[in-house]
Curated annotation (Swiss-Prot):
PANTHER family: ADP-RIBOSYLATION FACTOR GTPASE ACTIVATING PROTEIN 3, ISOFORM H-RELATED (PTHR45686), ADP-RIBOSYLATION FACTOR GTPASE-ACTIVATING PROTEIN 2 (PTHR45686:SF10). This is ADP-ribosylation factor GTPase-activating protein 2. GTPase-activating protein (GAP) for ADP ribosylation factor 1 (ARF1). May regulate coatomer-mediated protein transport from the Golgi complex to the endoplasmic reticulum. Hydrolysis of ARF1-bound GTP may lead to dissociation of coatomer from Golgi-derived membranes to allow fusion with target membranes. Interacts with the coatomer complex. Interacts with the C-terminal appendage domain of COPG1. CDD domains: ArfGap_ArfGap2. Pfam families: ArfGap (PF01412). Residues 11-127 form the Arf-GAP domain. The lineage of its organism: Eukaryota, Metazoa, Chordata, Craniata, Vertebrata. It comes from Mus musculus (Mouse).
């Protein structure tokens, strides 16, 4: 087994390999001064692309640093020597692999073939040269420039061929003519030359004509530049007319295409709408058939609950027909409520305030009743405004009414509490029935009725419970027996307020009658 190369040998080899122009840039991204290498492909990479290769795995690309790593083997160095960026670029381009994605590029068939090729060439070079520093493809003498040889290989595959400076140099073209001139000048000294006597004059003419034909394009170009300056050509009016006609034709064609597309879209939309309407008609017919099979009550319930389309068919319309306005009828409940409000307003018409002297009581189209109806609104307002000014002593504002009501309630509660204290002063325990007098009153009434009926031979339920007293008129009914004390006070207060309102209404009616008919 061959010994490992020393660090000096590794640096010498990579210094010479990095001096090649194609190896001065990254193989993947083209970054300058790459310091990493892929032994699997024999190419030089930058640090970013080396990370990408390392993520691919060692089975696809084995990465090492050309400056930091010192444990290179001779097989790895031979792979780098037989490889190179230029050879890899040419091989991938030859096999049609031009992908930029690293995963796609290095998992392709071309990459697999190139890996195998580099491995075979490196093994062959190691077997042949052993531990020699250079191989046959590289010059062992440092005086010879290896860059020139590698640059020729690079220009052959990646760049356009360079021009021959010797062919384009005018001094070079004139140098060979000098010996011919000198030889022609030296011919008289040697004697007359008869070699040209056998030449045909037509050949010389043909030669001159070919030379003139070659120079004619240059002369024409010079004349064109002298006349037109920048080589512009005059455009005739006919060309403008032709261009304008073509533009008009293109515009018409574009408009026609747009109209056709719009028409086609409308037709498709109408067709889809017609199809949807037909489907709705079919569904409605199915629902009608289902409802016809039902009995009378079930059918009415289905129509009322909206379980079919029959009840909605009266207000449905076709999407292809014109829209029709559907007016909603006024419901009967609104009329009834309005009539109740009008009846309430009619009551307020009697409370008309001061008359309007601008109005004529005998104007056309007005009657006595309609006149009062028209004045109902402001008459009610006047009632509300004049209500505090009524002279009747029983009418009070709302605040005073509530205060008086509260006073009555407090008085009644105070009386009840004092009576309860006196009544149950010596009792040890009382119940709610005893406190409110329910139990005592019922027992007392029952005992009194039994005493009254003790001497009678026969009694009835009406006599026992006292139901017929009010019917025969034998007993007297008072508000005290019907309503409690607090309710009696409220009832009296309500009667007083109603009486006051009636007085106001009567006063308003009398004032309006006097104002209207008093002068007649």
């Amino acid at each position: 087994m061959a010994a490992s190369p020393s660090k000096t040998e590794i640096q010498t080899i990579f210094k010479r390999l990095r001096a090649i122009p194609t190896n001065k840039a990254c193989f993947d991204c083209g970054a300058k001064s790459p310091s990493w290498a892929s032994i699997t492909y024999g190419v030089f990479l930058c640090i970013d692309c080396s990370g990408v290769h390392r993520s691919l795995g060692v089975h696809l690309s084995f990465i090492r640093s050309t400056e930091l790593d010192s444990n290179w083997s001779w097989l790895q160095l031979r792979c780098m020597q037989v490889g190179g960026n230029a050879n890899a670029t040419a091989f991938f381009r030859q096999h049609g692999c031009m992908a930029n994605d690293a995963n796609t590029k290095y998992t392709s068939r071309a990459a697999q073939m190139y890996r195998e090729k580099i491995r075979q060439l490196g093994s062959a070079a190691l077997t042949r040269h052993g531990t020699d520093l250079w191989i046959d493809s590289m010059n062992s003498a440092p005086s010879h420039s290896p860059e020139k040889k590698d640059s020729d290989f690079f220009t052959e595959h990646t760049q356009a061929p360079a021009w021959d400076t010797a062919a384009t140099d005018p001094s070079g073209t004139q140098q060979p003519a000098l010996p011919s001139e000198s030889s022609s000048l030296a011919q008289p000294e040697q004697g007359p030359n008869t070699d040209l006597l056998g030449t045909s004059p037509q050949a010389s003419l043909e030669l001159k004509s070919s030379i003139i034909g070659k120079k004619k394009p240059a002369a024409a170009k010079k004349g064109l530049g002298a006349k037109k300056g920048l080589g512009a050509q005059k455009v005739s009016n006919q060309s403008f007319t032709e261009i304008e006609r073509q533009a008009q034709v293109a515009e018409k064609l574009r408009e026609q295409q747009a109209a056709d597309a719009k028409k086609q879209a409308e037709e498709s939309m109408v067709a889809s709408m017609r199809l949807a309407y037909q489907e709705l008609q079919i569904d409605r017919k199915k629902e009608e058939k289902k409802l016809q099979n039902l009995e009378g009550k079930k059918r009415e319930q289905a129509e009322r609950l909206g379980m079919g389309l029959v009840s909605r068919s009266s207000i449905s319309h076709s999407v292809l027909s014109e829209m029709q306005m559907i007016e909603q009828e006024t419901p009967l409940s609104a009329k009834s409520s309005r009539s109740q409000l009008d009846l309430f307003d009619d009551v307020g018409t009697f409370a008309s305030g001061p008359p309007k002297y601008k109005d004529n009581p005998f104007s056309l189209g007005e009657t006595f009743g309609s006149r009062w109806d028209s004045d109902a609104a402001w008459g009610m307002d006047r009632v509300e405004e004049k209500e505090p000014e009524v002279t009747i002593s029983s009418i009070r504002p709302i605040s005073e009414r509530t205060a008086s009501r509260r006073e009555v309630e407090t008085r009644s509660s105070g009386l009840e509490s004092s009576e309860a204290r006196q009544k149950f002063a010596g009792a040890k325990a009382i119940s709610s029935d005893m406190f409110f007098g329910r139990e005592v009153d019922s027992e007392y009434e029952a005992r009194s009725r039994l005493q009254q009926l003790s001497g009678s031979s026969a009694i009835s339920s009406s006599d026992l419970f006292g139901n017929m007293d009010g019917a025969h008129g034998g007993g007297t009914v008072s508000l005290g027996n019907v309503l409690p004390t607090a309710d009696i006070a409220q009832f009296k207060q309500g009667v007083k307020s109603v009486a006051g309102k009636m007085a106001v209404l009567a006063n308003g009616v009398m004032n309006s009658l006097q104002d209207r008919y008093g002068s007649y």
